[in-house]
């Protein structure tokens, strides 16, 4: 029977084959006509790539069917070397969750029941009410806006 093979250039070649022929045999015949080695050939029929060991009958290829010939691409992305680091990775700061942390910000006087703030609140408008400043040994610091008040140092 006669089948057609459409090459990359759009040229159509005709091959005389039997339905019992394997795909390997068809590729060998294409090599004889076109000079393309069989290991670089990929034959496609009805959207499926044809495997070398199978026959034309396995793929239901009949007389005057058209196979499409495309070339196999070799390779891919360049292999990358694994990075080696000279120093160990820096440990990230872990946020310490303190239960009932609000109790550290205010003090209730037992006798009068009056509430007093233990920490200074940030006066900046962008921070808003309830944003307390961190109490360092020599300054008050707002972590939200960066406002800093340094204590007067007596010499």
From Swiss-Prot:
Superkingdom assignment: Eukaryota
GO terms for MF: mRNA binding; protein tag activity; structural constituent of ribosome; ubiquitin protein ligase binding; zinc ion binding
UniProtKB keywords:
Cytoplasm, Isopeptide bond, Metal-binding, Nucleus, Ribonucleoprotein, Ribosomal protein, Ubl conjugation, Zinc, Zinc-finger
Q: Where are the zinc fingers (C4-type)?
A: 122-145
Give the position(s) of the covalent cross-link described as Glycyl lysine isopeptide (Gly-Lys) (interchain with K-? in acceptor proteins): 76
Look up the record and give one Gene Ontology term from the biological process aspect: protein ubiquitination
Q: What cellular component GO annotations does this protein have?
A: cytoplasm; nucleus; plastid; ribonucleoprotein complex; ribosome
Location in chain, cross-link Glycyl lysine isopeptide (Lys-Gly) (interchain with G-Cter in ubiquitin): 48, 63
CDD domains found in the cross-reference section: Ubl_ubiquitin (cd01803)
The record, for PANTHER family, names:
UBIQUITIN (PTHR10666)
Q: What else is known?
A: Ubiquitin is generally synthesized as a polyubiquitin precursor with tandem head to tail repeats. Often, there are one to three additional amino acids after the last repeat, removed in the mature protein. Alternatively, ubiquitin extension protein is synthesized as a single copy of ubiquitin fused to a ribosomal protein (either eL40 or eS31) or to an ubiquitin-related protein (either RUB1 or RUB2). Following translation, extension protein is cleaved from ubiquitin.
Q: Which family does it belong to?
A: In the N-terminal section; belongs to the ubiquitin family.
Name of the protein in question: Ubiquitin-ribosomal protein eS31z fusion protein
């Amino acid at each position: 029977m006669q089948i057609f093979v459409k090459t990359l250039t759009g040229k159509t070649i005709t091959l005389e084959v039997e339905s019992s022929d394997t795909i390997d045999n068809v590729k060998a015949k294409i090599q004889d006509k076109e000079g393309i080695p069989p290991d670089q050939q990929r034959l496609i029929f009805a959207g499926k790539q044809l495997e070398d060991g199978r026959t034309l009958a396995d793929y239901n290829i009949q007389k005057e069917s058209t196979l499409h010939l495309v070339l196999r691409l070799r390779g891919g992305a360049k292999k990358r070397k694994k990075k080696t680091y000279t120093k160990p990775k820096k440990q990230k700061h872990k946020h310490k969750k303190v239960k009932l942390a609000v109790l550290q910000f205010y003090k209730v006087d037992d006798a009068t029941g009056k509430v007093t703030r233990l920490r200074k609140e940030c006066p900046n408008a962008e921070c808003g009410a309830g944003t307390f400043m961190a109490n360092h040994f020599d300054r008050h610091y707002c972590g939200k806006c960066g406002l800093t008040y340094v204590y007067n140092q007596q010499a």
